[in-house]
Amino acid sequence: MNLNLKFAALSVLASLLSACGGSNGFPPVVTGVKVQSAQYGKMATIYLGGKDLRSNLLIDTSGACTNPTFASNSNTDTLVLNCVVAKTGDFSLVVQTAEGAAIYSTTLNIPLPQVALITAEGSITVELDPTLAPISTNNFLSYVNKGFYRDTLFHRVIPNFVVQGGGYTTGMVKKTEQSAPIELESNKGLSNLRGSLAMARTNLPNSATSEFFINLVNNVSLDYKNAANPGYAVFGKVVQGMDVVDAIAAEPTGVVGGFSDVPLADITLSLALQSK
């Protein structure tokens, strides 16, 4: 999945080269790189500052940045690259001439994605694992970033087991417009321990959509055993606000709209926001 961004290979660069004045015989010099809004799964902007920068430079991000496009405000002093962040952790960014000579290199860092779940009871911050559970992580972030979880409920609360949310609104009305079900990622080495975040599903393994749950205790019985007992896919963990989760778990529950274990007073997820 290595990405070699060959600037000259992108059709948009022909116009950029013209706008930048083309090659003037001076060697390009990169004096610094600045990255703006670098969050996993989102569009990042990379500013390459220097002198005599040309659009036939090569940039290698080792697959960390995909779908590259150049902003129209690029010039010979600043090349502005937009791309989608596809990896986390440290990665090298190397700028090369068209002949392959390295003229600048630096190491950039993309943090693990985090999402803030905002409720009246308080905020819960979950950290996701796109390395071991990329399908579940990308699915969850897709729902988060399109605002799907706004005003949904923690609709299933079972003390000493789980709190579950992400699929219903007030009155236990099922929310529509879910994306297609995703492939189960339960056999990836992540366990349903206290505080872990996992995808809820039906009895069919590959049926998870928007609903998720947080484990209140070590529920290793929910882990993958074999193909006949595939378990539930963990894709993250609570890193802040487990006390809020425990407070939700202490709320009285009953039967609402034919559903059991429903909090008698709505516990509303007012907003889910990607914070990193």
Where are these regions (language model features)?
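Sec-dependent bacterial lipoprotein signal peptides
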Residues: 1-18
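Cyclophilin-like peptidyl-prolyl cis-trans isomerases
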Residues: 20-276
